[in-house]
């Protein structure tokens, strides 16, 4: 029986374990997780009766294997959720599916509403060509945006950076209004300094043309799931108690199948002999512990993996690339408030008539805040009193060790509250409770030595018993389903003896990957 060591109990690590162990898989699997939580950045934090989704995670994939995998762990609702029942909303229901009012292990169907908040006006996210958009932008700006887009269609810029990538798809005016400032908040760099790879992996086929096509297909009813850009979906699945609930369920599945999960095990060293990993050394509450194995699956940051290699040291070139790999860190501030000052002027009804958004993207350059999550709208079960209070998450992008990261929790909450008051989102005396969470290396970034990452991949592929999976494991800003697919490809390669890592690294690198794999 081959011994498999998996580093990290996030979506990729847990998926890899289940894929290896299911159907009587003859593997001795151990997952080493540095924290006490399951799901990595997809975990759910519980605080004073309310729950926080750290980054906001929609359960949607163009890959049917992933959708089936989720549904197998957490069946789709068969009866309406609390808010849908109260408000008379109709949702697709699974025959004989669980009732979320009486059962916990249930996947909800939720409406996707995400908008941009810019200059105290709401705009659709992604930008749409609705009369309301034109009204909020003003006639002159709308005309400028239209001519700017036509100019961009005729005079294409070389896509050598993210700025040109966006301008080619939206024109200079819309880029300046809705992409430039937010991107700089997210990465701490101007888009002209960032590789276009990020756009191709996160935005993919999204453009003004795609938005117009989507509107046309909506009118004439010709859309199917395989054709819809992820940024354009209108409904998604969501666990009753947030994404962490599904990954906690996945962890229990790993144990049922005979796998082991050890928490509080922070991998610090990767011991190598030649081009073979032999063991990993972890810091634990009881001191250092060593875990030997035949196969190693890593979802830890590539920088930490390379700099932690011992026994056989990587060459100077690889070490320099690893040292220069950039990351963006993340702080989220949860605020429990009596009400929001934002008016619900949509045709969507909500509990307490709050705005219906799951996410609000904050484009104003005068505040540091990047996004607002409204947890009531993700799932009413995330909030202890969903009709009387609003539980929001304020998302900030920063660098570990900078002034914002080092703020005390009290000062951070005051700062976040002041920004919301400045924007007119809340009144100062409305805050009832608060909580802060900090996440290191939340976003692998696409600048500095990232341009040499192909060299890193070639080096990592020289280790026949080492597989890199997931967002940080591949230094790729993947969605949750992409991270899972890297793990599924890895498990398949291990089970079949396939030596090439090409399919593992290629997940989410080409626009049509999911359509090709799922046959949509």
Task: Name each model-derived stretch.
Residues 23, 239, 265-410, 414-424, ...:
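Mid-domain catalytic core of redox enzymes
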């Amino acid at each position: 029986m081959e011994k498999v060591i998996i580093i990290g109990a996030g979506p990729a690590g847990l998926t890899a374990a289940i894929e290896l162990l299911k159907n009587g898989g003859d593997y001795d699997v151990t997952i080493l997780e540095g924290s006490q939580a399951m799901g990595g950045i997809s975990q759910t934090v519980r605080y004073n009766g309310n729950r926080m989704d750290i980054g906001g995670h929609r359960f949607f994939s163009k890959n049917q294997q992933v959708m089936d995998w989720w549904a197998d762990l957490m069946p789709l609702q068969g009866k309406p959720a609390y808010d849908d029942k109260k408000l008379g909303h109709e949702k697709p229901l699974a025959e004989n599916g669980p009732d979320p009012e009486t059962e916990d292990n249930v996947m909800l169907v939720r409406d996707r509403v995400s908008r941009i908040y810019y200059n105290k006006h709401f705009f659709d996210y992604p930008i749409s060509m609705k009369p309301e958009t034109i009204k909020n932008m003003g006639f002159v700006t709308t005309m400028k945006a239209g001519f700017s887009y036509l100019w961009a269609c005729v005079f294409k810029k070389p896509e050598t950076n993210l700025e040109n990538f966006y301008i080619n798809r939206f024109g200079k005016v819309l880029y300046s209004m809705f992409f430039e400032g937010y991107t700089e908040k997210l990465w701490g760099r101007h888009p002209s300094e960032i590789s276009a790879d990020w756009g191709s992996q996160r935005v993919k086929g999204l453009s003004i043309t795609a938005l117009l096509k989507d509107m046309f297909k909506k009118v004439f009813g010709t859309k199917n799931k395989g054709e819809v850009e992820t940024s354009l979906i209108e409904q998604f699945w969501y666990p009753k108690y947030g994404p962490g609930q599904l990954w906690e369920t996945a962890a229990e599945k790993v144990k049922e199948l005979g796998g082991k999960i050890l928490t509080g095990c922070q991998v610090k060293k990767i011991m190598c002999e030649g081009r073979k990993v032999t063991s990993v050394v972890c810091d634990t509450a009881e001191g250092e512990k060593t875990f030997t194995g035949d196969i190693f699956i890593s979802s830890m940051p590539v920088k930490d993996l390379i700099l932690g290699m011992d026994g056989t040291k990587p060459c100077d070139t690889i070490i320099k690339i690893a040292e220069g790999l950039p990351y963006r860190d993340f702080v989220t501030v949860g605020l429990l408030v009596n009400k929001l000052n934002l008016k619900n002027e949509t045709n969507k009804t909500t509990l307490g008539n709050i705005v219906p958004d799951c996410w609000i993207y904050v484009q104003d350059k005068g505040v540091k805040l990047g996004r607002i999550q409204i947890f009531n709208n993700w799932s009413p079960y995330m909030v202890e009193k969903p009709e009387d209070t609003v539980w929001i998450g304020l998302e900030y992008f920063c660098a570990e060790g900078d002034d914002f990261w080092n703020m005390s929790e009290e000062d951070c909450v005051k700062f976040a509250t002041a920004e919301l008051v400045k924007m007119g989102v809340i009144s100062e005396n409305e805050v009832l409770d608060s909580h802060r969470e900090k996440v290191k290396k939340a976003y692998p970034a696409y600048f500095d030595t990232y341009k040499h990452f192909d060299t890193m991949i070639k080096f990592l592929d020289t280790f026949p018993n080492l597989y890199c999976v997931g967002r940080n494991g591949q230094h790729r800003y993947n969605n949750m389903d992409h991270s899972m697919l890297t793990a599924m490809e890895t498990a398949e390669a291990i089970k079949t003896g396939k030596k090439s890592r090409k399919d593992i690294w290629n997940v989410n690198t080409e626009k049509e990957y999911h359509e090709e794999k799922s046959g949509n």
